[in-house]
Amino acid sequence: EQSDHDIRIKAHVNQIGDVEAPEVSFEEMCEHAEDNEVRCGHPETAARMRELIDEYQEAGDSIGGSIAFEVRGVPRGLGAPRFDSFPSRLGQAMFSIPATTHVEFGLGADARTVTGSERNEDWTFDEGDNPETESEAGDPVPVGNDHGGLQGGITTGQPIWGEATWHAPTSIPKEQRTADWETGEIVEDAQVIGRHDPVLPPR
């Protein structure tokens, strides 16, 4: 999607269960994500995801998954170092979506193996020829973007990228064991009747 401020947002389903798509570019997400039911930017993986979803649906069960997202055109300098940081505000919005269990920016959890010197990344001066960034020629910019366009809670002008994960829908037709609050008895064959989504990320 594109806003009035030329901010471009795109996401695609990058994993369903144990079926994971290879990394795809922003352009590939734009080109392929809406071409299939699961909204995966990698067509071959999308077909495998569809098969897996069908398996769980036929069994009356469900499965979790995740999306990869990228935002371009966000001006640098938005956010704050602490309570009003850009990632905390964006994370709050994403965690407001039911069933969200994990949100990460840049390297995310992989940052646990990165040293402080690596995390700092090298800096240089923008030559003014990179359409992906919102900086101008002569501006100081990081050479890489492992931090996901965010440093110290503030936007850098580079693409903001990361992932969000949703657990499997828990309202499923498969019979399960539960406890009846009113009778105080164990129910061995509880079943949820109604419409059931076998997976959430494509939505």
Task: Give the predicted meaning of each segment.
Residues 59-187:
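Glycine-rich anion/phosphate-binding loop at the beta-strand->alpha-helix junction
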Residues 1, 202-203:
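Well-ordered alpha/beta subsegment
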Residues 182-202:
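Amphipathic, heptad-repeat alpha-helical segments used for oligomerization and assembly
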Residues 15-24, 116-118, 184-189:
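Short, mixed-charge aromatic SLiMs
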